[in-house]
Design a protein with these regions (language model features):
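Short amphipathic alpha-helices in soluble, non-transmembrane regions
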Residues: 65-73
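Structural motif
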Residues: 37, 73-76
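Conserved short beta-strand edge segments in small beta-sheet-based binding/regulatory domains
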Residues: 75-87
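Helix N-cap motif at beta-to-alpha junctions
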Residues: 58-64
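Short S/T/G/P-rich N-terminal loop/turn motif that feeds into the first structured element of a domain
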Residues: 1-51, 62, 85-98
C-alpha cells in the first residue's frame, strides 16, 4: 500500500532548536527518511520555515508505518493517509493511451 505522510512540528519542539540543523537530534529525528525492512520511503520533501515535511511511502500495513514514524509523532502532528496509484490503475484498465 502507498501512504502519503505529512509531518510537522513547531519551533518549540524542533530537533534543531539547540545545535542547529547539524545537531545529533536532527539526524536522529530524520532517520525515518531512510525507511526500514518493512517500509520503503519513495520520496520526502520539506519546507523548513513552517517545519513541515511530506513523504510518499510504501508498506504492507499501517502498523509498520506507525512504528517507523513514532519519533515524528512524538514531536508534532503527523498525518498518514493511504492513497491509490491512479496512473497504475488507469494502465491496468487499458485506458493509458501513450
Amino acid at each position: 500500500m502507498l501512504f502519503h505522510v505529512t509531518a510537522e512540528h513547531d519551533h518549540l519542539t524542533c530537533p534543531g532548536r539547540e545545535g542547529g540543523m547539524g545537531a545529533d537530534a536532527v539526524r536522529e529525528a530524520q532517520k525515518w527518511i531512510e525507511g526500514n525492512d518493512e517500509v520503503k520511503v519513495l520520496g520526502v520533501w520539506a519546507h523548513q520555515p513552517p517545519h513541515k515535511s511530506w513523504a510518499i511511502i510504501e508498506a504492507s500495513d499501517f502498523a509498520a508505518v506507525s512504528a517507523l514514524l513514532r519519533g515524528q509523532m512524538l514531536i508534532g502532528k503527523t498525518e498518514v493517509m493511504p492513497v491509490n496509484d491512479n496512473i497504475a490503475a488507469r494502465k491496468a484498465r487499458g485506458w493509458w493511451e501513450s
